[in-house]
């Protein structure tokens, strides 16, 4: 049994003893033995004992109760009015008894408060113990679940590793086969060394000629493989995020071996400064560049770098300028006859993109529109040194409806727009003067293409898309006849 319950039992026993003693002793003290059922104020009494004299106003009235409605012991003594008789021995004894009863009642109240406090403490401790017991059960169940999960994970891992057993067996067999091949190659090498010693000088020269002939045929084959029909464009590769919404960037397809400079031109008009980065890595990771100031501002985003020179359209004119980047001098200027300029025949996105210069495997090109061709696209093959037009083709595609354009292997490819979903849907073959509508989608990742050019060295499309410099790899389809080898 808990401590609070023991204390409550002691209190109730003490109260019962006091009540019994008072009911037997008080009447004998005052000389009365009358029993009466009554009620006390402040609560309903289960049992009351009254001591009533013949004249209640001149004597004591004592009431005792086992408990009230709240479970507490009530002892009440009503003193009579003071008279000369109150000084007798019995009155003195009653007063002393009253003081004892009052002291005992106060002690009982203190004991009751302590009991209530201890009971609350025990209940609190009991709740905490129940909480700890629940937590221990949860920890135990969680531990079991954790072990089960670990077991399942190990079992799943074993199931994943099980298929590797036959692979390991095959690997062992392949290792033996590789050793066997190695021995055979060593034997073959020794045989070839013996044959080389037996072959004379004449036979060696004949073999060398055959090898040279084969190299020439392979080189011709590679040249044919360099050109083909566009069949696919890869997902974009973001190289850098820099500059305004409009601009152009490029590398030189005829740069010396080992040189990989990047040229960067922000904005589409009334700007003269060209940034030169030493390498693609510098362009991607640093802001270390050399600045070149052009003698005239450019127009549009159709500039190209070709064989050490930059070709651009002079602002508010149809003049093309060739500027040497090494000596920083103008090498040649020429007017592109009848070409529209100053936003007369721009691409769909605007931006003074009337004249677009391009480079492919065949050299330098200019794409523009004229009044004579009703604003439709015109293609001119240019001499890179003199800028003279070598040959011109008139197409039936309106230049203002084109999003952007680029040339691969002499074929002009035109996109249907510059924002949102974009695709290449028109192709004009200059070698046959024919065109066709195609459907080659590509991802317009940043929703605003203002420059799209092909680089034959990298076989990739360079694009400026809403302040992002990106690359697209291209897939070309080749058809080579056996008599061409």
Swiss-Prot record:
Residues 1-16 form the signal peptide. It holds the Pfam family OLF. One of its GO terms (cellular component) is axonal growth cone. Residues 226-478 form the Olfactomedin-like domain. It comes from the Eukaryota. InterPro entries: Noelin_dom, Olfac-like_dom, Olfactomedin-like_domain, Quino_amine_DH_bsu. Disulfide bonds join 227-409. One of its GO terms (biological process) is cardiac epithelial to mesenchymal transition. Residues 87-225 form a coiled coil. Glycosylated. The protein contains a globular N-terminal tetramerization domain, a long stalk formed by the coiled coil region and a C-terminal olfactomedin-like domain. Interactions between dimers are mediated by the coiled coil region. The dimers interact mostly via the N-terminal tetramerization domain, giving rise to a V-shaped overall architecture of the tetramer. Contributes to the regulation of axonal growth. May play an important role in regulating the production of neural crest cells by the neural tube. Homotetramer; disulfide-linked. Dimer of dimers, giving rise to a V-shaped homotretramer. Component of the AMPAR complex. This is Noelin. It comes from Gallus gallus (Chicken). The gene is OLFM1.
